[in-house]
């Protein structure tokens, strides 16, 4: 059985989130949460929260029949979201653009074969 969770419009660069996602791809859920707990990256907190949400979705979807210890991170993908454009005033009446990037993160958890 598979369970999914999505985090959309996260106000962080997809490149920075991808480094955290690579750490936990293919790992058991318990190990992934432990890795994220001790990772000193800003992206670790929202990804940890997302995995906990996917675990809650799995238990709710199966009405409590799923064993959380058998779940692993099957896929985790980080996609680019829309960029927010802001402008910073500069000298002589000019302005330069600032691009505030967003990201979409999708997690799929699956049960390991016994």
UniProtKB/Swiss-Prot annotation:
Looking up InterPro entries in the UniProt record yields: Ribosomal_uL22, Ribosomal_uL22_bac/chlpt-type, Ribosomal_uL22_bac/org-type, Ribosomal_uL22_CS, Ribosomal_uL22_sf
Q: Which GO terms describe its biological process?
A: translation
* Source domain of life: Bacteria
**Matching PROSITE patterns, A to Z?**
RIBOSOMAL_L22
Q: What does this protein do?
A: This protein binds specifically to 23S rRNA; its binding is stimulated by other ribosomal proteins, e.g. L4, L17, and L20. It is important during the early stages of 50S assembly. It makes multiple contacts with different domains of the 23S rRNA in the assembled 50S subunit and ribosome. The globular domain of the protein is located near the polypeptide exit tunnel on the outside of the subunit, while an extended beta-hairpin is found that lines the wall of the exit tunnel in the center of the 70S ribosome.
In the record, the note on similarity to other proteins reads: Belongs to the universal ribosomal protein uL22 family.
Name by which UniProt lists this protein = Large ribosomal subunit protein uL22
Species annotation? Myxococcus xanthus (strain DK1622)
Q: What is the lineage of its organism?
A: Bacteria, Pseudomonadati, Myxococcota, Myxococcia, Myxococcales
Q: Which gene encodes it?
A: rplV
């Amino acid at each position: 059985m598979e369970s999914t969770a999505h985090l959309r419009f996260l106000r962080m660069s997809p490149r920075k989130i991808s480094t955290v996602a690579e750490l936990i791809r293919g790992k058991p859920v318990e190990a992934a949460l432990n890795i994220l707990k001790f990772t000193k990256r800003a992206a670790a907190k929202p990804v940890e929260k997302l995995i906990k949400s996917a675990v809650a979705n799995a238990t709710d979807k199966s009405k409590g029949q799923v064993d959380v210890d058998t779940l692993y991170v099957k896929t985790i993908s980080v996609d680019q979201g829309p960029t927010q454009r802001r402008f910073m005033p500069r000298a002589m009446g000019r302005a330069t653009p600032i691009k505030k990037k967003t990201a979409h993160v999708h997690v799929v958890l699956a049960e390991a074969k016994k």
